[in-house]
């Protein structure tokens, strides 16, 4: 009998209308789940990956799930809380060291970065330029200022810097000037207002993506401190991983993937020697890289076009005597 059934409720893997998340099979293979292991899903979302981990855990296994989105936590409480193997924490994965449940060490950690499909699909969350809603973009709507509050407050130079740094938007200065000019007449409050303004000032080109794509990405990353949280979360995850534990990170754009790749390489590979500098201490690797960048198969892309930009990287913490 499966442990979920022993717990006296419907196995989460058999719940109706479960949508498989991106790189589902590859994530489970990368984590290499052991029956009595302890695993952390730092970006629960709607629980797709968490369900997969639970199907491979035995009665003594443990799954810790985190998310800073209260709607995601509500789903976790509803669907996962009855399972005694599951513990739930509302917060960013950057805070995982503050969660006492992680102190015993972890056999695997998963971060599925960026905005989730439910966040994009619900206009009221304010993430999508394709659906008009309040200009919010906060993953935790109870924390920090909204995108509207920020964009109506700061100078054009700061807006331009954010659009360039986090969106690699070449027209960042033009867009920033237009935003400031428009808000002097009427402050921004809706996603459609911002998307339409950006589209109106962008030069026509061959780019197939919506003109506001990069700007919305940049503002969202800034509002949610996504890259700073990622760097803190990577450090915390490696600290909590047991020797032999696996770290699996899914990223969706080059800024995230660059941070993940460089971080894993820095802990896995000795830096190149520099004759001009004093001899460095002997490099002791902390991680072993497990393969390279993993992307969705053609079959998955046909079923889920949003997986086209997903990149999975996996690393394993070295044994103490390795």
From Swiss-Prot:
* Example GO BP: rRNA base methylation
- One GO CC term, this protein: cytoplasm
Give the Gene3D superfamilies listed for this entry: Putative methyltransferase TM0872, insert domain, Vaccinia Virus protein VP39
Catalytically driven reaction(s): cytidine(1402) in 16S rRNA + S-adenosyl-L-methionine = N(4)-methylcytidine(1402) in 16S rRNA + S-adenosyl-L-homocysteine + H(+)
- EC annotation from Swiss-Prot or TrEMBL: 2.1.1.199
List the GO molecular function terms: rRNA (cytosine-N4-)-methyltransferase activity
Its localization reads: Cytoplasm
List keywords of the entry alphabetically. Answer: Cytoplasm, Methyltransferase, rRNA processing, S-adenosyl-L-methionine, Transferase
| Function text | Specifically methylates the N4 position of cytidine in position 1402 (C1402) of 16S rRNA.
Q: What is this protein called?
A: Ribosomal RNA small subunit methyltransferase H
Q: What high-level taxonomic lineage is stated for the organism?
A: Bacteria, Pseudomonadati, Pseudomonadota, Gammaproteobacteria, Lysobacterales
This chain is encoded by the gene named: rsmH
